[in-house]
Amino acid sequence: MARKKGDGSLRALVIRFRRVGDAVLAVAACSSLKRSFPDIRVDFVLNEAIAPLFEGHPDIDRVVTFTDTDNANPWRYVRRVFDVVRKTRYDILIDMRATPRTLLFSLFSLRTPYRIGTRKPYSRLLHNYRVADRIDPSLDMVQRDLLLLSPL
């Protein structure tokens, strides 16, 4: 994987909204990114209510929060997503949900070399790396989340 010009570090955005349990399990992917790419900067997108659980985690450089107000107003949400992805040019975007709402991050990040998400019919145009998350029913959620790192 090529390094960014300038400071030489890769930048990753991991998107895992809503449920606290799912977000806690998703930290394993952030930790794996840090082990594989020690200089990587990992930003983690969460709802504001659960963000304090992740602030200060050694494998998460920045917690990007969305408020209930951001999520309730579609125009505000779109603007907020746009601001997040334009503020930092990411090398890797990992969409752990691949819902129509989270796909907006990929839509505004078409120059991001690795736009990774789960394989869904509607994600084909926006994720350039799609991973089948139901490939093995014996896999737990952490293992399925880690599969999203396989394109790297």
At which residue positions do the language-model features occur?
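Catalytic machinery of carbohydrate-active enzymes
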Residues: 1-152
